[in-house]
UniProtKB/Swiss-Prot annotation:
The chain crosses the membrane at residues 20-40. It is a single-pass membrane protein. Belongs to the membrane fusion protein (MFP) (TC 8.A.1) family. The keyword Transmembrane applies. One of its GO terms (cellular component) is plasma membrane. This is Type I secretion system membrane fusion protein PrsE. It is found in: Cell inner membrane. It comes from the Bacteria. InterPro entries: MFP, T1SS_HlyD. The gene is prsE. Part of a type I secretion system composed of PrsD and PrsE.
């Protein structure tokens, strides 16, 4: 037996060597094949981040500035609405009544202003530039215009009457002046005759042909005529003075009238400005009786449910949430991955709220990258927020599934492809890089 073993021992060694060589070659081939595959095969890589569906323009609150009473409620929870669509119509009874009062008052002031402007210019008639029928019913407008025209004619007639009385008095004084002038001319003629007669009588008296009494009588008559002339001159001057006073009175009448009209006109202009502002405010309030949707979307958190309910100023009545085409995903990217993120990068989104077996991933792209990191106050974790917009054609693959703000999402941000060997060696190279930097 021992001899047999010794005889076959070299053969066994050769067989084992052959097996070892075969295994070694096979191992080298396997290592070379795997290494070649790892070095040449590229795998798609992506950064994975959590996200949430948000609204581009955010959810819009529907509020009313002044509040009021609900007249009509035109929507219900979950309704789809278009931008500008009427959601709630407030009761407008009080607003319309207030506007009617303001417009009626404004029409009166417009008519009064036209009359006063015509009176100030001394016109024989007036026209109103504004169409009063826009402010009050046609019959009321006609009555208002007719009333102002009657007042215009009455005031014009009253002024004309006062001026007529003064003109009559002035004409009387003119006649009086004329009569006094005639009397003065007669006195002057009489004085001239007495003077001639007195000259002749003085000559005869010097010759002793006439008595002294005759001379004295003529001188007395002359003195009386001169006194009368003085009184007539004074009376004529007084009459002329009164005539001048009448002229001043006529001027004063016009001046007082213009002053009164100017004051009234100033007051009316101020009132018109005030009521025009009030009309603008009332018209705006009337326009805001219709509470409309600020954008297209769906109604949520409807707070008003009954007609005749009271709305407080600034109260949130409902939310309008834009639908999927206006939605984006906000993702939180770790700080060590931000250097690989660029605007326009392709992204795949998986909405975890849906059935993962039947719901396809949605294609999207990065639209904004935050310039600075954000720290979550609750957890203390830091991250960079990204905005990712789903592509419309990819959203269509959801086949009727709706996205809503707040839904969770998982995003895969595609980055450069890497070989398998780079995945295997990266931890080692990172450790070596840190090791070589130690002091």
């Amino acid at each position: 037996m021992k001899g047999w073993l010794q005889q076959h021992k070299p053969t066994a060694r050769r067989s084992l060597s052959r097996h070892l060589i075969g295994v070694s070659v096979l191992a080298l081939a396997l290592v070379a094949g795997v290494g070649g595959w790892a070095a040449t095969t590229e795998l798609s890589s992506a950064i994975v981040a959590g996200g949430v569906v948000i609204v581009d323009d955010n959810v819009k609150k529907v509020q009313h500035l002044t509040g009021g009473i609900v007249g009509e409620l035109l929507v219900k929870e979950g309704d789809r609405v278009e931008a500008g669509q009427v959601l709630i119509r407030l009761d407008g009874t009080t607003v319309r009544a207030n506007l009617a009062i303001i417009e009626s008052t404004l029409a009166q002031f417009y008519a009064r202003r036209a009359r006063l402007q015509a009176e100030r210019m001394g016109a024989a008639s007036f026209e109103i530039e504004e169409d009063l029928a826009e402010f009050i019913p046609g019959t009321a407008a006609a009555k208002l215009i007719e009333g102002e025209q009657r007042l215009f004619a009455s005031r014009r007639s009253a002024l004309s009457g006062m001026k007529g009385q003064l003109d009559s008095r002035k004409a009387q004084l003119a006649d009086e002046v004329e009569g006094l002038t005639v009397q003065l001319n007669a006195i002057e003629e009489a004085l001239k005759l007495i003077a001639e007669e007195l000259t002749g009588v003085d000559s005869l008296f010097g010759q002793g042909l006439v008595p002294m009494q005759r001379v004295t009588t003529l001188k007395r008559q002359r003195a009386e005529l001169e006194g009368g002339r003085g009184r007539h001159i004074a009376a004529r001057a007084q009459a002329r003075g009164k005539s001048s006073e009448i002229d001043l009175q006529i001027l004063q009448l016009d001046e007082d009238r213009r002053s009164e009209i100017s004051k009234e006109l100033t007051d009316v202009e101020a009132k018109i400005a005030e009521y025009e502002e009030r009309r603008t405010a009332a018209t705006d309030q009337l326009r805001r009786l219709d509470i409309t949707a600020p954008l297209s979307g769906r109604i949520y958190q409807l707070a008003i449910h009954t007609v005749n309910g009271v709305i407080n100023p600034g109260e949130t009545l409902m939310l309008v949430v834009p639908e999927a085409e206006d939605l984006t995903v906000e993702a939180k990217v770790a700080t060590h991955d931000i250097d690989q993120i660029r605007v326009g990068q392709s992204v795949e989104i998986r909405f975890s709220a849906f059935n993962q077996r039947t719901t396809p991933e949605v294609e999207a792209e990065v639209v904004t990258v935050a310039p600075d990191l954000v720290t979550d106050e609750r957890t203390g974790a830091s991250y960079y927020p990204l905005r990712i917009r789903p592509k419309a054609e990819s959203l269509a693959k959801l086949k009727g599934l709706s996205l809503y703000p707040g839904m969770p999402a998982e995003v895969f941000i595609k980055i450069a492809d890497r070989t398998v060997i780079s995945y295997l060696t990266k931890p080692l190279t990172d450790q070596m890089r840190h090791a070589f930097r130690e002091d």
